[in-house]
């Protein structure tokens, strides 16, 4: 058996060379392993989108990841937006850069970020000035035929090519290589001869690459279609952008050795370069934003002070709500606070809590509605004390350890709901406070999903729209269904493919391209705040249409490198509540405070029991209305349960019916052990919440709440090995507590079953509070509530119609638009609502402002006066 030739691919485009590269990262690593390559590089066009995914997928594979990029270098200044005929496309040359080490990574990160932020002209371009400032730690290859040296060689401008290569070799001493490719293109053969001349004259080392754009030779056709999708052309277009050969695949070392038989050193140098590239990331360090405490106070001390002061203030409200609160119960609050603070400090997260509290309290101080909580953070008393959340976790048995587990160190994740209209103001505040160069949103990638890829490929093949549309519509309407699964479920698709070679080509190509990244966009909520310039940690992308900056790594990988992200979510219901409260205060109750409601209001529960919940947060769908009329919630715990139960899992399992039957006494509530009653009493003996699983583990088997959270996670993931381990721990613990083994086994199995459907009670409770507030407003202040709801839904005619129907059902008259009485929004007039101009189709903002401005001088007497006084432009 002959020895494998030395070779590593150093010029390769993954799917993150959007609509140009067709290599999936996982497939790349698998193929490199199959070829027994010691390393492989990813060099996407002008970006590092896939760098972190690639690096992590290589871990444990035996393949060393080499992070790089094929950057675009402007022929002149990166700021010049004029085409330059000196370059092939008129705007940029190509250049391969590979990271040797962490310094190189930071420099490459800065370079590709600069391309988007400063040099974008069709492509994200850098220039030689910025390259010279950030060349350390990078190995440079002269690139393909579009590289400057190769381009000059192809035009027989060898002296200029030598001068250019000399410049690069001086900038990258011992780190600059002349790149050769063998792809059967005649122009490549010509360029190679002259590239060899340049290398000889300057004594520069050679390197062999293949500019891989797809994995296998057989993928060349699919790749051609991918290029058509990118350029909006069809395969029938002779002038379309295309690769003139089918050689740009991930060749084996043997194929590369055969192609470069004349330059064995070019092959050997690929391995030498790979040996020089030793970039390592620290995934154990969190990079917290710099939050400055007052002089003489540490972050720990600041959080301690704010939490104690905040809880003392909160207790004033708690005592008013629960007049029979005992000193022992009050002490319980401070004991819980102590436990949480110790855990937060021990885990090193005080700064995180202070940062979140700072921007939430800034929002509240500026009249921006903020939700009472979201996710597991609602289980934290510290979060409640420092006004991150507005739900007291103790009365509802919400667990801090579900949010932050001392036995499993991971970054806390506090998601925050803001008024949809003013969310951007909070992001702007954070950006200004921490620095524009340290804050940005997070990228996300749209992929070619089953129906979409059929349509894309159909267009590229120039097939009739009707035919393609008919095939695309055969894909079953199942969220996230793959084309492969669709072909199994819908035999008609296979029949069409068998009877028509064009349809077969369409589906075969669609299968090949499905799932590839199609475009970059911005994550709806995620914002990253770094301690230093963001490019130190992660490259930045700029959307050229909106101008917004995002990380080049998606959410998962941003968190993996230790950057701290915050989720700023927009929730329209908070705007509705805020506007309704303002209307109530402007009318009959100037002192009305929505945050001080008792949770046992009879009228609110009557409204819920009747299913009169149009406009009520989380409870307005027809299915939810049906559930409410059956369940008939009579306490706040029931609303929490409804929010948790209305999901496909519980509804399909029979546990919802069981819950209802037990609540109404039609089925007896039985507890296998008396210790379960305090835990399951509020849910009538049914395990509804993840927190209940944790409490059972603690009570019966002596788990710490941190350990119980690990058990909950294991049950959720259904890892057989971990489940077996946890089962032994549970049974052993139960035995120590004198619990019968058979009963303990039965309870463990019951927990495992319900863990599949169990919901996070903290999240349910926080959202139940918003639901209750909207129900209260609708029950007690229906005119104000529905006016606020109609105003918020003005842009959606269907919702306006539905809300007006709801007004009529509640006996509230909606008065028609009146040129002398309507405002932009819906107005409250006694027990009536005046229709707002903003909900009238084709009446724009400027027209409304012109009418309202003219009306300040008095009402309009007739149409003629209206036309005379209102600016008709």
Question: Model features per residue range: what roles?
Answer:
Residues 38-42, 51, 58-61, 214, ...:
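Noncatalytic, beta-rich nucleic-acid-contacting surfaces in large DNA/RNA-processing enzymes
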Residues 64-100, 196-208, 212-219, 223-279, ...:
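Phosphate/diphosphate-binding loops
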Residues 69, 140-143, 816:
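Non-cysteine beta-strand/loop elements that form the S-adenosyl-L-methionine
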Residues 88-90, 131-134, 519-521:
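Solvent-exposed alpha-helices and their adjacent loops that cap or buttress functional pockets
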Residues 99, 112, 142-144, 180-182, ...:
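Short, structured patches in soluble enzyme cores that scaffold and shape functional sites
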Residues 2-42, 46-61, 110, 114-219, ...:
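Domain-core and long-helix interface of multi-subunit machines
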Residues 80, 89-96, 102-115, 623, ...:
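Covalent nucleotidyltransferase
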Residues 57-61, 82-86, 114, 195-196, ...:
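Short, hinge-like loop/turn segments at secondary-structure boundaries
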């Amino acid at each position: 058996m002959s020895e494998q030739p030395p070779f590593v691919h150093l010029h390769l485009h993954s799917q993150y060379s959007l609509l140009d590269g067709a290599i999936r990262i996982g497939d790349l690593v698998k193929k490199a392993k199959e070829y027994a390559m010691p390393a492989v590089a990813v060099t996407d066009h002008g970006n590092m989108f896939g760098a972190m995914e690639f690096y992590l997928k290589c871990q444990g594979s035996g393949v060393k990841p080499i992070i790089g990029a094929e950057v675009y270098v402007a022929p002149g200044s990166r700021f010049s937006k004029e085409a330059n005929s000196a370059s092939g496309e008129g705007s940029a040359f190509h250049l391969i850069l590979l990271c040797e080490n962490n310094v190189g990574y930071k420099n490459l990160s800065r370079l590709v970020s600069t391309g988007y932020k400063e040099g974008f002209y069709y492509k994200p371009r850098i220039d030689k000035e910025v390259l010279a400032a950030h060349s350390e730690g990078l190995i440079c290859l002269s690139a393909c035929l579009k590289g400057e040296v190769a381009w000059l060689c192809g035009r027989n401008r060898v002296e200029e090519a030598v001068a250019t290569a000399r410049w690069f070799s001086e900038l990258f001493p011992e780190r600059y290589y002349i790149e050769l490719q063998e792809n059967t293109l005649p122009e490549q053969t010509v360029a190679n001869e002259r590239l060899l001349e340049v290398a000889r004259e300057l004594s520069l080392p050679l390197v062999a690459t293949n500019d891989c754009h797809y994995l296998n030779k057989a993928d060349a056709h699919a790749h051609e279609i991918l290029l058509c999708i990118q350029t909006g052309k069809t395969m029938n277009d002779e002038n379309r952008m295309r690769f003139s050969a089918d050689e740009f695949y991930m060749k084996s070392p043997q194929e590369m050795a055969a192609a470069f038989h004349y330059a064995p050193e070019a092959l050997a140098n690929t391995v030498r370069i790979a040996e020089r590239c030793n970039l390592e990331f620290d995934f154990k360090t969190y990079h917290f934003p710099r939050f400055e405490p007052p002089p003489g106070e540490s972050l720990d001390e600041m959080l301690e002070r704010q939490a104690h002061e905040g809880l003392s203030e909160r207790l004033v409200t708690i005592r008013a709500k629960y007049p029979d609160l005992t000193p022992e119960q009050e002490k319980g609050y401070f004991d819980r606070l102590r436990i949480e603070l110790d855990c937060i400090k021990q885990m090193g997260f005080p700064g995180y809590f202070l940062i979140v509290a700072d921007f939430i309290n800034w929002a509240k101080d500026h009249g921006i509605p903020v939700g009472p909580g979201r996710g597991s953070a609602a289980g934290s008393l510290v979060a409640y004390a420092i006004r991150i959340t507005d739900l007291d976790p103790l009365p509802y048995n919400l667990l801090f350890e579900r949010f932050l587990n001392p036995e499993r160190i991971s970054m806390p994740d506090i998601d925050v709901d803001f008024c949809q209209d003013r969310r951007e103001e909070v992001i702007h505040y954070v950006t200004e406070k921490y620095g524009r160069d340290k804050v940005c949103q997070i990228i996300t990638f749209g992929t070619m999903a089953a129906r979409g890829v059929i349509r894309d490929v159909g267009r590229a093949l120039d097939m009739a729209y009707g035919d393609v549309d008919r095939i695309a519509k055969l894909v079953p309407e199942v969220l996230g269904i793959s084309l492969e699964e669709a072909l199994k479920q819908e035999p008609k698709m296979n029949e069409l493919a068998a009877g028509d070679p064009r349809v077969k080509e369409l589906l075969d190509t669609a299968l090949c391209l499905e799932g590839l990244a199609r475009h970059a966009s911005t994550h709806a909520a995620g914002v990253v705040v770094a301690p230093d310039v963001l490019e130190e940690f992660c490259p930045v992308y700029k959307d050229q249409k909106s101008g917004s900056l995002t990380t080049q790594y998606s959410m998962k990988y941003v968190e993996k490198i230790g950057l701290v992200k915050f989720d700023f979510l927009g929730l329209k219901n908070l705007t509705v509540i805020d506007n309704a409260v303002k209307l109530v205060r402007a009318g009959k109750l100037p002192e009305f405070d929505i945050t001080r409601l008792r949770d046992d209001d009879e009228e609110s529960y009557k409204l819920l029991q009747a299913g009169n919940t149009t406009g009520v947060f989380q409870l307005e769908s027809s299915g939810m209305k049906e559930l409410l009329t059956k369940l008939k919630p009579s306490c706040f715990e029931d609303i929490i349960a409804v929010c948790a139960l209305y999901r496909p899992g519980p509804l399909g399992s029979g546990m919802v019916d069981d819950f209802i039957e037990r609540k109404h006494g039609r089925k007896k509530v039985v507890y296998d052990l008396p210790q379960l009653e305090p835990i399951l009493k509020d849910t009538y003996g049914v395990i509804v919440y993840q927190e209940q699983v944790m409490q059972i583990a603690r009570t019966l088997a002596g788990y710490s709440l941190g350990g119980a959270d690990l058990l909950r996670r294991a049950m959720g993931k259904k890892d057989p090995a971990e489940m077996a381990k946890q089962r032994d721990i549970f049974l052993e613990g139960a035995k120590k507590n004198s619990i019968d083994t058979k009963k303990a086994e039965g309870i463990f199995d019951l927990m495992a079953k319900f863990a599949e459907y169990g919901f996070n009670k903290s999240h349910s409770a926080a959202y139940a509070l918003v639901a209750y507030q909207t129900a209260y407003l609708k029950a007690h202040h229906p005119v104000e509530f529905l006016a606020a709801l109609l105003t918020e839904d003005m842009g959606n005619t269907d919702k306006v119609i539905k809300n007006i129907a709801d007004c009529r059902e509640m006996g509230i008259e909606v008065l028609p638009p009146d040129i002398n009485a309507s405002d932009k929004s819906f107005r409250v007039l006694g027990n009536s609502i005046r229709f707002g101009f903003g909900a009238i189709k084709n009446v724009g903002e400027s027209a409304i402002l012109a009418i309202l401005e003219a009306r300040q001088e008095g009402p309009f007497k007739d149409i003629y006066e209206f036309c005379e006084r209102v600016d008709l432009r």
